[in-house]
């Protein structure tokens, strides 16, 4: 977008229909507040299935998509925005859909030269009955984010996680099962500039309760972030380059965040996933990395909006 924020009507999408609704509401509020502080006209939209009608009536100049998870992050809302021909932020239909499918995105990234973990895709009921791979391993829904529905099966466990087979399970019939990689939890934010993707820095994340789950990500004090991460120089550099490679290989636009595990005993860096709609909450990793390189929260939100386009 070439016009200044003060001349723009920005619709901020938040909330939505997924299990990550509360995180999205917090992200959306932060972004909307930042835009209003820069004189933009802002419409805050708790996005539902009537979104197309709401946007048609509002006629915004641009949509800032702060939705997370199913429907808002998987290509569905992006398709609505493409159909309405409204400039919007973050990745387009294909990259969004691909990144939300962990199994398919791993195949694309592996082909591009990104080091990904082993394991595979399994029926959740089979995973609930037996160990499909030797412990320790991680079970995660194939199409969820924010560590929703993620379980760690520790070494020596006699039985797998039975919750995965329960009728109340709402995260899809197929789950990813991957070997647990000991060591450090790392992430890298990437900004897709005109000259190519630029990785910001590497954050080392230490959960206060031992496992980086939903609570550790979003609860105050749930994790400790160290940036830049204290890593061997070659590992730090590799994380930056692998994150940029993932951004490009997946066709991401705007901002993305890549997550890694680093086994510091075996000196092995393994890519976990790319997030096309990273959180923008007070404890989120991307705003933190942006601040480290001199970009304030307000600057980051402005850049994201200025990067909007249609088609993506």
Residue ranges of each PLM-predicted region?
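Conserved metal-phosphate-binding beta-hairpin within the catalytic cores
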Residues: 179, 247-280, 290
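Phosphate-binding site of ATP-dependent enzymes
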Residues: 158-241, 269-270
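C-terminal active-site "lid" helix and adjoining low-complexity regulatory extension at the edge
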Residues: 268-312
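ATP-binding N-terminal substructure of ATP-dependent carboxylate-amine bond-forming enzymes
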Residues: 1-94, 98-100, 104, 111, ...
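Hydrophobic beta-strand scaffold residues
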Residues: 42, 87-88, 116, 137, ...
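Active-site nucleotide/adenylate-binding loops and adjacent lid/helix of ATP-dependent enzymes
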Residues: 1-14, 55-57, 98-183, 194
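Short, flexible, mixed-charge acidic loops at enzyme active sites
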Residues: 78-82, 212-219, 276
